[in-house]
Curated annotation (Swiss-Prot):
Gene Ontology BP terms: mRNA processing; RNA splicing
Principal location: nucleus
Protein name (Swiss-Prot/TrEMBL): ADP-ribosylation factor-like protein 6-interacting protein 4
Chain intervals with Low complexity compositional bias: 21-31, 54-65
Species, as recorded: Danio rerio
Gene: arl6ip4
Length: 221
């Protein structure tokens, strides 16, 4: 009887130990309520963050109506400024064109009112008239044959030219009193004379030049 009681006691102890072990293991496996609360709180935070990020991304992707209004206002202001600048430019251009037109009209009126200056014909001085007359050639009078040949403009033959050039004439200028040797149609030759004859010729020529000049000026000795 004593052995059976001891066996039953040992068995009951073993059972109790097994139960306590199983309870401790189950309690160890089960998370504590504080830990569960923390886990739930962190999961809620994560969810909130996700929602915020999604809302911020959606707000950034789709512009808000206030921003759109501001952008429209800025656009309108820019357009208004551009229009003002263009109007100012147009006004300036119109003013410039008006000024140019007025200047042109004034210039035209001045030119029309002021007559063009008529150049006055100055009477020629005696010196000029004398010089112009001096330039004229007072050569010998041409014969009818020479005039006819000049009018026909026929080229001379060699014989005709030599025959004409062989003729030497002494021609007197009635105004100056000078005598010249002329060969052919008008080639003036220099006459070789003595010193005394040369002096006489110079005296006569100076006298004749003085008389001719006084006649042109209208002065008489």
């Amino acid at each position: 009887m004593g052995g059976s009681d001891s066996d039953s006691r040992s068995r009951s102890r073993n059972r109790e130990e097994n139960k306590s072990r199983s309870l401790s293991s189950s309690s160890a496996r089960r998370p504590s309520p504080n830990h569960e609360k923390k886990h739930e709180h962190s999961s809620e935070k994560k969810k909130m963050k996700r929602r915020r990020s999604s809302s911020s991304s959606s707000s950034s992707s789709s512009p808000s109506p206030s921003r759109e209004k501001k952008a429209k206002k800025k656009k309108k202001r820019r357009e208004a400024k551009k229009l003002k600048r263009e109007k100012k430019k147009e006004k300036k251009e119109k003013k410039r064109q008006k000024k140019l037109a007025l200047k042109a009209e004034r210039a035209a009126a001045l030119t029309a009112s002021v007559p063009a200056p008529v150049p006055e014909e100055k009477p020629q001085t005696y010196l000029k008239t004398w010089q112009s007359e001096e330039t004229k050639e007072h050569g010998p009078a041409m014969t009818d044959e020479q005039k006819a040949k000049l009018s026909t403009r026929r080229p001379l033959t060699k014989e005709e030219y030599e025959a004409r050039q062989s003729v030497i004439r002494r021609v007197l200028d009635p105004e100056t009193g000078r005598t010249r040797l002329i060969r052919g149609d008008g080639e003036i030759l220099e006459e070789i004379v003595s010193k005394e004859r040369h002096k006489d010729i110079n005296k006569q020529s100076t006298r004749g030049d003085g008389d001719a000049f006084q006649k042109r000026l209208g002065i008489s000795r």
